[in-house]
Amino acid sequence: MKHLFCIGLTLLCLACASDPQKEMEKKIIGEWCNPYTYESTGELKGFSFKKGGVCEAINIPSLDLKTWSIQEGYLLIKGFSLEEDGKKEVYETKEKIDLLNADTLCVVAHEANPRLVFLYLNAKIIKERVRVDTMSHE
């Protein structure tokens, strides 16, 4: 009887196991900003990922972002880039999610040499963790 109970409990746990993609989608909701831009300029620039796949650029006037999704560990962002001459160009990215937790989003834009990685911090904690370089503002 005890053995059957353990098997039943194990099956229940497997049935209720979380979907890794859904977990990533929950974690990414929020505002993510580039710490290096904040450190050098004091400006928060990055992305706002909202429920339902809505995406907006934060303080980046040249981007008119529309949607985001996660597919097989990749972050996909779609929208338009706005050129200086007023033209709109399709903007689409597909970047591998290297690290995603409550504070940090790290995506790999280019795997081969040179490897290109972008780091973003959650906007809620960036001011606590990154000091603005006041010398560059003078």
List where the protein language model places each region.
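Sec-dependent N-terminal signal peptides
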Residues: 4-14
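Lipid interaction determinants
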Residues: 16-138
